[in-house]
């Protein structure tokens, strides 16, 4: 083993490496639990410092630094300094010797047949002609790359250049780091890169800032727009603007950092949303009174796919011991032959649906992590062999392909979410919840989540559109030199849009699930109030006859209570004594059936059940509405007779997060607050 001139371990042959093609390392990266991996990402995101060494940058660290209000500081490894210096000196020395190198003594791309000895001037011209982006005017022009994406790109480009194969001074990397740490962000154009010879156009604006180009602008820590001089002053960069030496301009712009930087932040969110979708599916099972059998480990073991197995295991863990599942089991045992044997696909096949999407997102994450730790410019400076190697690592195909695949996975997750909320708001499918999850007293003046479902349809449609690939829209560029190109940043931008839409859907669905949880709580208390009232009225009216003797109708009480168990509360609770609703119809039916079997006793006023029906119904009308209202008020006041079952479930932390930490409230038509206000709280929170 020996250390080469770039400061890295060198090997005379790839074949001496046990994993020369890197397949083993790639496979090893995908072992273990995705959930554990996401937990690690979140821990890394929360770290206060990111130390760059060139080889071990994580997407979570990129996401942390990218945050516009980030307080994360970036440090450069001093150990990398010698390698960076060696490649920079090699370029200067080779030019002094008259060595002909691409981008050092030649023109660029299709015009590389041109030659010059003015190395510094050539780099300045490179930056000038690449400053071809359009920003427009006004804050709403929408043609500026988000500051978070620019910060991600700056971090990733530093990491690449630290590896010492690019021929750039360490001081320039320190200057970019100073801008990051001072929260000074150069303005880059949103569009104009095909991520083929890297992200040439947007990265040229970072180079323009470093060289003090008069058109360079940045956003300062307070959000104001500043020029390059003010940016350098705020960042505390000494010695003024840089005079680019040979190769340095090319080193700055000829890389995939913008596409891979944005892809990193996108995938950080996508991984978390993927885990959240697994948890949400389990909560969906709880509020829908589903059958947890769909998570049985044998089913998924026999299918073999790791994403599916893990998704099912997460759902099984959440549902194990769930109070909702215990209650649902009892309900399924009532008249089992009259109920569906299985739940619909949106619940029953959710592990099979989500598993492959998680595998795709995980694979894309590893691909992008390899990219942000790669050397991706051209030419590469190999000091150990005293040569510049001309290749094409700037081609951002891993970004374009990974982002296209991720976007398709995100769209599939969103589609499942839409299918689930469509069941949840539909009283034909939701096992007794009110239509539109209306929580108010009068369903004629409360349409609950109707607007939310319409919005979800819009989100889902746009998400499905975005699922279409970007990478099959390649145009030959740069005089047919860049005749195939990755479109990496374009695909990353579209995936960022898709993630944003999935966040909208997730926020809406989380509030809907919490609404359903609280409606189940209300349902239980209503049912208990109805049972108690019917039982008490039965005892008063049906137990004895006119003469005080025991009456045959006393045997009806048990059957009357069974009616309440079988009837969905929200089908009648807004007017429980209405004959248009099923409760009174079914209660009367019980009494009529007993009367019909009462035989000769019906002829006697003292023993006639028919003659008891009117008295029973009148007393019920007098008592039941009051008891139902009292039950509602007690739930609203937090003094309900029956506690909310969610507190006995493993999904409770998610409910508590939405209700208590974020403050999203139970929605009713009686309140002024709109659903969107509550969705917004969750959207900002996640």
From Swiss-Prot:
Gene Ontology biological process: alkaloid metabolic process; cinnamic acid biosynthetic process; L-phenylalanine catabolic process
Main location: cytoplasm
Positions bearing the 5-imidazolinone (Ala-Gly) cross-link: 196-198
Subcellular location: Cytoplasm
Post-translational modification: Contains an active site 4-methylidene-imidazol-5-one (MIO), which is formed autocatalytically by cyclization and dehydration of residues Ala-Ser-Gly.
Residues at which (E)-cinnamate binds: 254, 342, 348, 378, 450, 478, 481
Pfam families: Lyase_aromatic (PF00221)
Catalytic activity: L-phenylalanine = (E)-cinnamate + NH4(+)
Tissue expression summary: Mostly expressed in stems and bulbs, and, to a lower extent, in roots, leaves and flowers.
GO terms for cellular component: cytoplasm
Keyword field: Alkaloid metabolism, Cytoplasm, Lyase, Phenylalanine catabolism, Phenylpropanoid metabolism
Active site: 102
The family this protein is said to belong to: Belongs to the PAL/histidase family.
Function text: This is a key enzyme of plant metabolism catalyzing the first reaction in the biosynthesis from L-phenylalanine of a wide variety of natural products based on the phenylpropane skeleton.
Assembly with partners or alone: Homotetramer.
Protein name: Phenylalanine ammonia-lyase 2
Organism name: Narcissus pseudonarcissus
Gene expressing this chain: PAL2
